[in-house]
A protein has these predicted regions:
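A generic alpha-helix structural signal
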Residues: 7, 64, 89, 228-231, ...
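Short aromatic/hydrophobic contact patches that present stacked aromatics
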Residues: 76, 214-216, 295
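C-terminal edge-of-domain segments
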Residues: 290-300, 306
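A generic structural signal for short beta-strands and their flanking turns/coil linkers
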Residues: 15, 25, 213, 259-261, ...
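Short glycine-centered, acidic/aromatic-flanked micro-motifs in structured strand/loop junctions
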Residues: 79, 140, 298
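Conserved C-terminal guanine-recognition region of P-loop GTPase G domains, centered on the G4
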Residues: 67, 82-170
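C-terminal accessory "lid"/substrate-recognition subdomains
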Residues: 128, 132-138, 143-288, 301-303, ...
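Nucleotide-state-sensitive switch-loop elements of NTP-binding domains
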Residues: 1-119
Length: 321
């Protein structure tokens, strides 16, 4: 969503841009969300995951080499939320990319509803992705609460993560905490010119292991009206009104820890809808084109339990927000 806003700003400046979508999983849903940007001055490219680390690095380099021939003024590299930042910096230091590209700005998006207690792997990712950022932009701000309070809480959390990984940097004023609909041309200019920092930090033992998972569910044949309550169940948001209801929901603990769900489905009228959900918020918006896929991202996920939850016909007790 942020890339749509930022890329639109760059296009208003008359720039010719390329967007490289870099997804952690094997299917890139975000490409479909950006398709309306594609045109004479904006082209979309994609790298899908689902491969080993070295293959992914090679694909990243190869794609940037081909994009260098296109005469772009700016290339936006969109990593997945689960990303090894060393891949970006190391790749751009290699021949011939070091002669063809110059790093402009490193922009880190942090969820304003970020949970206070994260796993060690998640804390490392938060710290490593914030360490070199020129600017941190908060997403999913709660419009009913003071943005300053949310901003201070996130800054404190990011700084704790930086300390945990042995990074001496501390975030202070490098944060933009505004509803994205309220971002001005001056805000986008600040983001565009925010540059980046090079910081050192420690990679804790075990972070090389794949603690995060991405599960793909194709052709569930369920409508928006059926999937929205099912997705809320994944986050444990069913309304438990009595002991029997709580007993029915106890197996939700076996699902694993779900961070995000995104994808597409049709509503009862047959129109495509885009779903984007976190532990804090769910949005469902119309989209011109889609495909029947739902992606679940989290830690220690049990695929059979997740599928059972999504395909469960029993949706009573779930309330739409």
């Amino acid at each position: 969503t942020f890339i749509k806003e930022y890329a639109s700003y760059l296009l208003r400046q008359g720039l010719n841009i390329g967007i490289l979508e870099n997804d952690f999983g094997a299917v890139n849903v975000d490409m479909m969300l950006l398709q309306e940007l594609q045109g004479e001055k904006c082209e979309l490219e994609m790298i899908s995951g689902g491969c080993d680390k070295e293959t992914h690095r090679r694909r990243f380099k190869t794609k940037l080499i081909s994009m260098a021939m296109c005469g772009y003024d700016r290339v936006i590299v969109e990593p997945s939320g689960i990303y090894d930042v060393d891949e970006f910096f190391d790749g751009l230091r290699e021949e011939p990319l070091d002669r063809w590209y110059e790093i402009g700005s490193v922009i880190t998006i942090v969820d304003a509803g970020l949970e206070e207690n994260l796993s060690d792997q998640a804390e490392y990712l938060l710290g490593s992705e914030a360490a070199d950022a020129g600017v941190i932009v908060l997403s999913r701000l709660d419009k009913d609460n003071a943005c300053e309070e949310q901003e201070n809480r996130i800054i404190s959390h990011v700084n704790r993560s930086l300390e945990r990984i042995g990074c001496t940097r501390r975030i202070e004023k490098e944060v933009i905490a505004k509803d994205w609909d309220m971002l001005t041309e001056e805000d986008f200019a600040q983001i565009q010119n925010s540059s980046y920092q090079i910081e050192s930090f420690r990679r804790p033992e075990g972070t090389e292991k794949d603690g995060f998972q991405t599960l793909y569910f194709m052709n569930l044949n369920r409508t928006e009206e059926e999937l929205v309550p099912a997705v809320k169940k994944l986050f444990g948001k069913r309304g438990c009104t009595d002991d029997s209801e709580k007993e029915n929901n106890k197996n939700l603990n076996d699902i694993g820890r779900v961070f995000r769900v995104k994808g597409f489905m049709k509503n009862q009228s047959g129109d495509w809808m885009e779903l984007n959900a976190t532990t804090q918020k769910m949005t469902v918006n119309p989209i011109k084109e889609g495909q029947e896929i739902l992606i679940v991202i989290g830690e220690d996920l049990k695929e059979d339990k997740v599928r059972e939850c999504l395909e469960d016909e029993c949706t009573e007790g779930a309330e739409n927000e």
